[in-house]
Amino acid sequence: MNALDRLTGDAQTFIDKVWASSVHVHRTDPGLGESVLSLADVDHLLTETAIRTPAVRVAHDGSVLAESRFTRGGSLAGKPLTGLVDPVKLMQLHDAGATIVLQGLQRYWTPVSDLVAELELELGHPCQANAYLTPPGAQGFAVHSDSHDVFVMQTHGTKLWEIHGEGGPGELLLEPGVVAYLPTGTPHAARAQQAVSLHLTIGINQLTWRHLLSRLIDEVIADVPDEHLPAGYLADPDLLSAELAERLAAVADDVRRLDAPAATRAQAEQFLSGRPPRVAGALLDREALARGLSADTVLRRRAGHPCEVVPDGESLRLLLGDRVLRVPARLREAVDVVASTPRLAPRDLPLDPESALVLCRRLVREGLLEVGR
């Protein structure tokens, strides 16, 4: 089951009927949230690691607290460190009713990173993830709305949400197994109930029609000569208006000649080559390569890693998420097998044994494949 199915119950129905338009509530396996980010996971991050701001912020009674209230200084190899979270200060604030926010979890907590990476590929929009740890009976923020869509998933405890907007339930008790989708601008607030509450918010930093059209039109007007406006147009506006009409008509003609399918392909390629790197296990993979691959070595597609194949003359461009890899076009059939097969061995590729090993070694080094462990 893909990420969007897990969060919504039915990905296609969500895309067709809910996306960007209305609140949606899905009830799923109560263990889903804990498998992504448990209370023990958060305890580990806050009390056993050298986590620093801005990965953590703290809010109390609707206001974000100064970092100095929960951080300390330190040093590493003789160089100063700032913004280190002080777990003692942090717990004291939490005991007093403050909400602790873990920001950008997709960058440093693997289960969250995996979920977000899958969701990005399914939606075609960049995503981020924050977690909110709220003491019993506390409310971190007053009623507000976000400038992006969000999925909210309770992982521990319960929280009573006040949700307005199209399809909003008014009040919703969020507990493990409940996932809510709130479109941009949905007013909401939430209060923890009898126990400490932990929920994960996945924010969708949506790409918009305005964003796409602005980029395309910017490319068109980049060819317009950057010449002076006529002197004296303030006294005689006709000096400006007649030529402006001609230039606007020329720009409109250029816009009409834009190739929409080509622009769509360019948008997809930009997205599929501009994601953050995903190479967890790369050191272990290199150790496995040093020991040697065989025709029967089990290889897996790395989770959340795209592999879009784009023909380009005598080459193929492989869009790997964070970069573009070029390989000879004669490898098309083998590359298609890799792109469509979650688990394979070099012997599964339609190549001679040595060529199959060479290609697999390359794709392991590039991070698309990982050696089975």
Residue ranges and their predicted role:
Residues 1-18, 30-178, 186-228, 235:
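Active-site region of the double-stranded beta-helix
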